[in-house]
């Protein structure tokens, strides 16, 4: 028996040394070497974008947000699965014990006379006890790296789940900043909108008076009425937007509605022009790209497992058992066993081939997902930079409009003082200045929101 077991083990080891194991490789995905637009001098960092109040709100959101908590729980579950898979490397042990109490088979015979006839009667009485215990150890030799690749697949899945935490953190920080800056812009626009509404109402009354005097056509009243309706709608929109942004902050901070109302203010000055690293380095920091890469790693590991399933498996086992009806029998009747199990797939090749083809298809799909994720990530970064340039150009145009409107208002005020123009005409030039100032605030909001979106698209830098 020992000779047979040894021969089987040697045969398996020879197979391990001579056969060619699975050698699946990960697909290559090209990445551009340069950006289409030039970059600035400052390193990407949130520190230049935050005031203390916004930083505190972001910290509270990162601590209390439910999306991050759910992602953390999913990661913990994936880690537990990976740890369970790693246990397959360790030897497995078993322990069993049993006890029985059957009726004894000892019997006695006696004669009974019935009607002068002697009849033998046999009876069995009493109980007996029997106890037993056994212990065993088993271990599978990882000839073709099958167990290691199975564990690697679970670990890659766990790492892919971890990236959801990073993605959630980036998203939460960006959303908090956007809501905070939107509230700041609303706060800055509100007094301007209220002043513009008051000026428009006064202009409407003056225009009606001039129409009654025959100095203007009635159509001028309709034009000012349209402006008044627009001013009222703008002020109502600001109030509604403020409530919506407070609700967004409440959800992000896991607080009851209507949410906080911070004394927010837009950052002073222009957003910095960030210096970007090489595309490959930037993309490697993005959570979505990391998740796609871990998906490829997991699929590749599963393909290697399916390849290894086509090769023999070798496992060893050892056991020790004993038992008896008395304690002295436990030491006098032990039974030891050693075993070697060699599984060679010879008639299941079709199923194994289909399993391997399915794993290869999964790897191809994961590679396509990675390629698509890389392309979308590049497009996202370039889009944010293009939009930032567009907003900068719009802001420069707005500066020219504001200068022109301010100069027109100054000249109109001088002409009104000397009686060259009516008060309604001067009020309209003043309203144009207020409109340009509100447009400037909205563009500055877009500028900083785009900066936060760029930071998010860079993977946190």
Region roles according to the model:
Residues 31, 37-38, 215-217, 236-283, ...:
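Short, solvent-exposed, mixed-charge loop/turn linkers that connect secondary-structure elements
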Residues 12-35:
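Bacterial Sec signal peptide processing site at the extreme N-terminus
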Residues 63-66, 379:
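Surface-exposed, polar/charged faces of alpha-helical domains
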Residues 36-64:
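Regulatory alphaC helix of protein kinase catalytic domains
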Residues 212-240:
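Repeat-solenoid scaffold signature
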Residues 1-8:
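Bacterial N-terminal signal peptides that target proteins for export
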Residues 20-25, 52, 72, 88-167, ...:
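Small/polar-residue-enriched beta-strand and adjacent coil segments characteristic
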Residues 70-85, 168, 172-209, 224-227, ...:
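Amphipathic alpha-helical coiled-coil segments
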């Amino acid at each position: 028996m020992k000779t047979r077991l040894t021969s089987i083990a040697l045969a398996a080891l020879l197979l391990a040394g001579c056969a060619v194991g699975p050698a699946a490789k990960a697909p290559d995905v090209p990445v551009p070497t340069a950006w289409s637009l030039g970059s600035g001098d400052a390193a990407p960092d949130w520190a230049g974008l935050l005031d203390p109040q916004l930083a505190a709100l972001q910290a509270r959101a990162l601590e209390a947000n439910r999306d991050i908590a759910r992602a953390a729980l999913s990661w913990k579950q994936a880690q537990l699965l990976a740890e369970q898979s790693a246990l397959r490397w360790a030897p497995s042990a078993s322990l069993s014990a049993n006890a029985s109490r059957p009726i004894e088979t000892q019997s006695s015979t006696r004669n009974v006379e019935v009607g002068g006839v002697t009849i033998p009667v046999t009876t069995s009485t009493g109980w007996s006890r029997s106890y037993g215990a056994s212990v065993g150890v088993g271990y599978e030799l990882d000839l073709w790296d099958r167990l290691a690749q199975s564990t690697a697949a679970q670990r890659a899945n766990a790492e892919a789940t971890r990236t959801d935490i990073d993605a959630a953190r980036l998203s939460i920080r960006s959303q908090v900043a956007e809501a905070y800056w939107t509230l700041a812009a609303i706060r800055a626009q509100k007094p301007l909108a209220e002043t513009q509404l008051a000026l428009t109402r006064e202009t409407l009354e003056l225009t009606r008076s001039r129409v009654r005097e025959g100095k203007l056509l009635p159509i001028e009243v309709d034009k000012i009425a349209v402006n008044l309706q627009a001013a009222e709608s703008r002020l109502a929109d600001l109030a509604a937007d403020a409530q919506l942004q407070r609700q967004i902050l409440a959800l992000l901070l896991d607080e009851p509605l209507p949410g906080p109302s911070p004394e927010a203010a837009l950052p002073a000055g222009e957003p910095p022009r960030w210096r970007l690293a090489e595309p490959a380095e930037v993309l490697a920091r993005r959570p979505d790209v990391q998740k796609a890469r871990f998906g490829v790693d997991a699929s590749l590991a599963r393909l290697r497992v399916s390849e290894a399933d086509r090769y023999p498996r070798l496992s060893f086992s050892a056991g020790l058992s004993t038992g008896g009806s008395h304690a002295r029998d436990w030491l006098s009747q032990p039974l030891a066993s050693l075993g070697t199990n060699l599984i060679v797939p010879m008639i299941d090749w079709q199923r194994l081939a289909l399993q391997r083809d399915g794993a290869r298809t999964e790897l191809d799909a994961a590679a396509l997902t990675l390629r698509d994720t890389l392309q979308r990530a590049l497009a996202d970064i370039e889009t944010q930079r293009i939009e930032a340039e567009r907003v900068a150009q719009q802001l420069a145009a707005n500066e020219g409009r504001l200068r022109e409107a301010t100069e027109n208002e100054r000249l109109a005020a001088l002409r009104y003082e000397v009686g060259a123009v009516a008060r309604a005409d001067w009020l309209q030039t003043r309203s144009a200045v207020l409109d340009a100032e509100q447009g400037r605030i909205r563009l500055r909001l877009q500028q900083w929101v785009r900066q936060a979106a760029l930071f998010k698209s860079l993977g946190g830098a």
